[in-house]
Amino acid sequence: MRSQAKTETVSSKSSRNTHVIFRFADWIDIVLMVLGSVGAIGDGMSTNVSLVFVSRIMNTLGYSQHNPSSTNFKEEIQKCSLYFVYLGLAILGVAFMEGYCWSKTSERQVMKIRRTYLEAVLRQEVSFFDSDISTSEIIHTISTDTSLIQQLLSEKVPIFLMHISVFITGLVFSAYFSWRLTVVAIPTLVLLLIPGLIYGKYLVHLSKKSFKEYTKANSIVEQALSSIKTILSFTAETQIIKKYSEVLERHKKLGLKQGLAKGLAVGSSGISFTIWAFLAWYGSRLVMHKQETGGRIYAAGISFVLGGISLGTALTEIRYFSEASVAAARICSRIDRISEIDGEDTKKGFIPGEKMKGRVEFERVTLVYLSRPETIILKDFTLTVDVGQSVALMGASGSGKSTVIALLQRFYDPCEGFVRIDGFDIKTLQLKWMRQHIGVVSQDHALFGTSIMENLMFGKNKASMDEVISAAKAANAHGFITQLPNGYDTHIGNRGALLSGGQKQRIAIARAIIRNPVILLLDEATSALDGESETLIQNALDQVAAGRTTLVVAHKLSTVRGANIIAMLENGSVRELGSHEDLMTKNNHYAKLVKLQRQFGHEHQQDLQDRVNSPEIQQRWSTMNSVIRLSNRSSPDLIVSPITLESNHTTKINENIPSTSFTRLLPFVSPEWKSSLVGCISATTFGAIQPVYALSIGGMISAFFAKSSQEMQDKIHIYSLIFISLTFLSITLNLLQHYSFAKMGERLMQRLRLKMLEKIFTFEPAWFDVEENFTSEICSRLNNEVSIVKSLVADRISLLVQTISGVTIAMIIGLLISWKLALVMIAVQPLSILCFYTKKVLLSKISNNYAYAQNRSSQIASEAIYNHKIVTSLGSTKKIIEIFDNAQYEAKRKGRKAAWLAGFGMGSAQCLTFLTWALDFWYGGVLVQKGEISAGDVFKTFFVLVSTGKVIAEAGSMTSDLAKGTAAISSVFNILDRPSSHENTNHGEKMGTIQGRIELKNIDFSYPNRPSILVLRDFSLDIKPGTSIGLVGTSGCGKSTVIALIQRFYDVEIGCVKIDSENLRDINIKWYRKHTALVSQEPVVYSGSIQDNIILGRPEATEDEVVEAAKAANAHDFISAMEKGYKTECGERGVQLSGGQKQRIAIARAFLRSPIILLLDEVTSSLDSNSEQEVQDALARIMASRNMTTVVVAHRLNTLKNLDCIALIVDGTVIETGSYDHLKNIGGQFSRLAHAHDLKS
């Protein structure tokens, strides 16, 4: 609420303070803006100045048509034509100034804004990110808000100034040509302004609602595709498609309203025709009774009408000023905010004379987070850590362990009490100096999307290569780094995505080591790793911690038992304090926690430590081969590091996308053939309005030069009626045109999206493993590419039909009136077309390239904000800004090119317009002088053809849209035409009943996108119906792959998977999956209610069945305790629920299906002890209640003790099978593994 109130305040202030947009302009920018404004004003004036010469030519032609051979006639025509040449050259300069100066200053100012904003935000205290702002808001500001400002400065400001110039000079010149006409016409301005403003505002309102509605649809798809295996496993495809279809239906209705609004908005511009009817009538009166000239009446009228239209356009641009003002005010409010704890401020605090020793004291500390003032995090917390001593912090979630780590880094200041280092209150120390002596390794590795070298140098900015290598060796990282393609210069992807978890953690450790810290802070540094990888990493940490003051936060006993002191925290206070042996002797809270953890196999015994320290393992450290295999095989999707794969030249799936004909869309469009026909007829007819209007203008002007007043009146009456008719036709035809094409386009878009999603759900999961088929890419295709297809079929075809009609009719009329003049005008139009095309298309292309170049710097900013705690801890703000500046260099280079092209494009387009006018009028005068045509013919031909060049250029600029549309159609049909091994989900045998026997016979398997890496080798396993089996082995041995094959997420080519002796490939896949259920390590919970999540895949379930499933999953009690019970919203991806709650909901979902085959994949690996026990109890209850075949994957062996059978897998092969007791007693590999995991009752 507070943040919202601030935003509203900022918005209200910004509406009154537009100058805030220009706050970062220096003197160079001011000069550029002044010159750009002069250019824009000059550009706007040029049209009205040209009318001075147009009126003179018209009067010369009109009044001299009975004596065209006079010398004065020829001289006047030549003189006015020459004036047009001069005006064209002048406008070349001012338009270039307009385009170049505003483009250049926008690029300069926005780059300064982005840099200053990012630096200011990174200097804020951590609590600022907790309560005042979200990460997404900052990223939105850096990308979207700054883009709004850039768009305003580069496009909207010059356009606004130009249109205001046209309006003001239009009124001035209109009064100059005929003040009487101007005074009478002023009230009609209202007719030009109000309709467009009202409909335009309503159109914007509908656009926002439409965007919001599709965001909901996109969220449904994004959540479903990001957990595609869960959707397929629970056969929930139909449910997702139904929800998606309902939202798309609402989106379609809004699209139809947009079509109507657009028709009204465009059609209302036809009101200008009615104004011309009035001006023609009143102007004829002035010619007859006030001795006004026809040329000046036309010039006065066109100046007034153009001025009114320009004012309406300028007023619509004001909303961009408002939006940019709000964005700029929002940015400046963050820049101006003074950080309460600024780690970059070297003026505050002092640096002690002696080197830091590392004694840490917490004295009666009380802390409350500003974001949760009602909750006390630490209360009367007291703890002392002597120099070189290691202290472990243990306790339940929320007890304050990580808060202690945060306080020592001075992320927060305590409400009461003191935090001291070497006896000094840390509030009095220079913060940058203090943090330089602290090293941090957390569970979240917090790496950046740059090279390994730069990531390590975040720890010490000026570190030498020797220091970097030394730190990497100390962290056991040097071996795998040197095996990467580019060694230390290897780029590791967004947030280190191209490295495994173990590799990332070791780089984070090296980054801490390179600082040579006096105090080392380890916050859950190994919690997300498997057993053996954890021990190897822990070994590196133990070596690093030696001789340093160390604080360790962990919930695993194996991590903390070697600490000098263990502090047991509860409710923000130290409940117990002492060594491991002392606390075990007391037999209190710590001892109970140890016993609970031993029950679930968290503690590693000393023999495992000995094994890690053995020569064999140390040799593995040096070569890193086995470590890479272990750390990278933590899931089926990461068998080896993608970087390693790249160096091995592994073939990547690449589907060539052939060009697709537009005719492929006909079946999707054909249901709306009536709407298409009405739209095309309306567009064709409306296209004819422009040349008819131009012809009428030419006729009106010639009528002003009629021989008699009666003849003038008769002709003006006819043209006035034509103008009025054109107004009603314009509104009617635009309504029909835009609504019909909107109806066709919206329904086409709805059909394509539904068909694509239905098709995507038939694809095998291997398809989703390829980078170009990641969730974000698929969502982009459904959103952007289908929208492009819709725009192509509806908007672009509508405009194309309208343009072809208008240009064709204009050329025919021109040729019929004066074929010689028409041919000359048509002949020079390619130049005009080329300039307008260059201006529109090239600028658009450069703008897109510039935006693309900005994306790199935005990505750096995004990572910095996402990892703001580690940036703060490392004091790396300047390093981030340095990388950010380097990333902006490419954008700066492209921006410079865009500025020159903007200036050249605008200048040449405007210049050639006036040069062609000069030629047209000169040649028209020549023809009139020769007596081949009349003055009226010149007027009519000129006005009919003068605008066709611009119209053709506008249509020609669609070539890029057509190319995009063709590519989009190809992309869409690439999905729709793609064959899938699972496409016909109703194909295959539906067995009468399923017993649950599973046979995997002689299987050799590799993932489709990694064909050279064998995951399973001659793998065989026979699982009897109704039995339970556990799959055991190190990370990457193939356990989860077996689960995937049983679900038929992948097909095997060598060997086979059988269910009840039937080949799984011959069984109806949808029917089969309805008899299975999967619960994985990461519980998938979707936005929606708890009940919606439980009934996923079985929507027909009754409320009693849902409650029964929840009770069986040990979830009913916590659900009932919530205010809305089963109707409680889970939030996106279940953010409102804890890990244990989400896991129990996932179990309830599985139980509701009454599965014959239950698959459990690392269900409890990421849970704390209490949550693990609750989930284990639920699983035990379910497995005991029904006769089902259960396959369990786990690395905590104690969870498998009660299973019927255990299979030990090594390198993709089953090497031992049997019961737990049998395998433990035979003295094989399982026995050694069991002892290593301390499996004692």
Swiss-Prot record:
Residue span, ABC transmembrane type-1 domain: 33-323, 676-964
Family annotation (Pfam families): ABC_membrane (PF00664), ABC_tran (PF00005)
Name assigned to this protein: Putative ABC transporter B family member 8
Record lineage: Eukaryota, Viridiplantae, Streptophyta, Embryophyta, Tracheophyta
PANTHER family recorded: ABC TRANSPORTER DOMAIN-CONTAINING PROTEIN
Species assigned in the record: Arabidopsis thaliana (Mouse-ear cress)
Binding site for ATP 2: 1033-1040
Keyword Transmembrane helix tagged: yes
Cross-referenced InterPro entries: AAA+_ATPase, ABC1_TM_dom, ABC1_TM_sf, ABC_transporter-like_ATP-bd, ABC_transporter-like_CS, P-loop_NTPase
Record CDD domains: ABC_6TM_Pgp_ABCB1_D1_like, ABC_6TM_Pgp_ABCB1_D2_like
Membrane topology, from the record: Multi-pass membrane protein
Localization per record: Membrane
A molecular function GO annotation: ATP binding
GO cellular component, one term: membrane
